[in-house]
């Protein structure tokens, strides 16, 4: 299992634990800070970072007496310095400062910087051998094998903070890796689960943002509507738990109560359940190897009444099929998959393409990448970032013809 601990055999740390939160003002960061707020005296905040939300960062820095804060956007640095003048809190700006925050001594770090920008800071924490709650998808989708190998070499402990992967992480502790036969990741099906393909094709932005169960950011909500997010999770699961594509199944589960299941060789299936609240998997990571008191609502199965499941439709939701294709292709294909999707979603939000064109742009970019002979194994973070950059450019160049095509 590499850097992901299969068994909870890490000694319990005595005393106050130091924590760093990268991406403290985003949705994952907000949930993390809420959990820290609910455990006064148990944790001390070392560093906090944000992309550009200086107002929220300053409030958190003062509330938690952080020792170091950093903002990625250079245009906001003056505001940050002025707001914290005389506080004794160190301030930094730009990528180097985010990396510095990740490099500072901490017992536990939340890696929640979104996008490819989160890769180098996460690697900096890995190199310190830190226990990392990983919420950044790009670390695994763009540089999975390289990232996990480096983590194992450095002795870093990677804890999956995403709800589905955290569910698998918990269920896997019921057996040994060589006893595993498959894992099952659940998907709500999103707002278009029952829609016809023709209706999905022309879905509006407002419709795509109406997720039935989860409260999330704009980008991930659109990814959930296309099931691109589930495709990314398939890729992440393969990297985290050293799985082949054939060992990973996706099951549509509209209630979002069962988050993941693991099947073992004796055909026992162990599942993790909980209300759809991101604070639950984050609390599991924050307390690990113990468990802390979480603020999520208690699960009441009697009031829910029914849990239903159905097979995913790879025809109506081609983004999921493309994830398996990218995983089997390897050699940077998953990086291309993610990068092209970023361009496609931005184009959809900007009303440049229809919803149905998101997956078509991703597929066209992947096919173009393979035809150009660009496939090559990743040897460094810079390799992953370069592929991400070049794939974005290719997707952007293909965008006009994809937008022009009638369906």
Curated annotation (Swiss-Prot):
Q: Which Gene3D superfamilies match?
A: 1.10.1740.10, NAD(P)-binding Rossmann-like Domain
The residue range of the signal peptide is none
Question: Which keywords does this Swiss-Prot/TrEMBL entry list?
Answer: Isoprene biosynthesis, Manganese, Metal-binding, NADP, Oxidoreductase
- Keyword Transport listed? The answer is no
The biological processes this protein is annotated with in GO are: isopentenyl diphosphate biosynthetic process, methylerythritol 4-phosphate pathway involved in terpenoid biosynthetic process
Q: Outline what the protein does.
A: Catalyzes the NADPH-dependent rearrangement and reduction of 1-deoxy-D-xylulose-5-phosphate (DXP) to 2-C-methyl-D-erythritol 4-phosphate (MEP).
Supply the name of the protein.
1-deoxy-D-xylulose 5-phosphate reductoisomerase
Organism taxonomic ancestry: Bacteria, Pseudomonadati, Pseudomonadota, Alphaproteobacteria, Hyphomicrobiales
Q: Which gene encodes it?
A: dxr
């Amino acid at each position: 299992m590499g850097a992901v601990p299969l068994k909870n055999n890490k000694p319990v740390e005595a005393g106050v634990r130091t924590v760093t939160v990268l991406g403290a003002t985003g949705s994952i960061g907000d949930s993390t800070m809420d959990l820290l707020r609910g455990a006064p005296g148990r944790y001390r905040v070392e560093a906090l970072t944000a992309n550009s939300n200086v107002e929220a960062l300053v409030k958190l820095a003062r509330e938690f007496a952080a020792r170091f804060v950093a903002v990625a956007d250079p245009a906001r640095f003056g505001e940050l310095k002025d707001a914290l003048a005389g506080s004794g809190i160190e301030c930094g700006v730009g990528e180097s400062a985010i990396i510095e925050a990740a490099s500072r001594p901490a017992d536990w770090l939340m890696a929640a910087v979104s996008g490819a920008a989160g890769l180098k800071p996460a690697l900096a924490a890995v190199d310190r051998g830190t226990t990392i709650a990983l919420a950044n998808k790009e670390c695994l989708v763009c540089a999975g094998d390289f990232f996990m190998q480096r983590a194992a070499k450095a002795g870093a402990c990677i804890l999956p903070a995403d709800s589905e992967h955290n569910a698998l992480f918990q269920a896997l502790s019921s057996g040994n890796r060589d006893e595993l036969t498959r894992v099952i990741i659940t998907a709500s099906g999103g707002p278009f689960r029952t829609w016809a393909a023709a209706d999905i094709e022309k879905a509006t932005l407002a419709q795509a943002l109406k997720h039935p169960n989860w409260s999330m950011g704009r980008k991930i909500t659109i990814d959930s509507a296309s099931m691109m997010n589930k495709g990314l999770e398939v890729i992440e699961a393969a990297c985290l738990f050293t799985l082949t594509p054939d060992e990973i199944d996706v099951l549509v589960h509209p209630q979002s109560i069962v988050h993941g299941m693991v099947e073992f060789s004796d055909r026992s299936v162990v599942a993790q359940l909980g209300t759809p609240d991101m604070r639950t998997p984050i609390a599991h990571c924050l307390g690990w190897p113990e468990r802390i008191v979480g603020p999520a609502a208690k699960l009441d199965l009697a009031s829910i009444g029914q849990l239903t499941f159905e097979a995913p439709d790879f025809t109506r939701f081609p983004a999921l099929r493309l994830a398996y294709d990218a995983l089997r292709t390897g050699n940077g294909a998953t990086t291309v998959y993610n990068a092209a999707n970023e361009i496609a979603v931005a184009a959809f939000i900007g009303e440049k393409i229809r919803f149905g064109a998101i997956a078509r742009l991703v597929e066209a970019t992947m096919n173009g990448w393979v035809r150009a002979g660009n496939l090559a194994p990743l040897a460094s973070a810079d390799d992953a970032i370069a592929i991400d950059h070049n794939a974005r450019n290719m997707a952007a160049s293909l965008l006009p013809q994809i937008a022009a095509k009638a369906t």
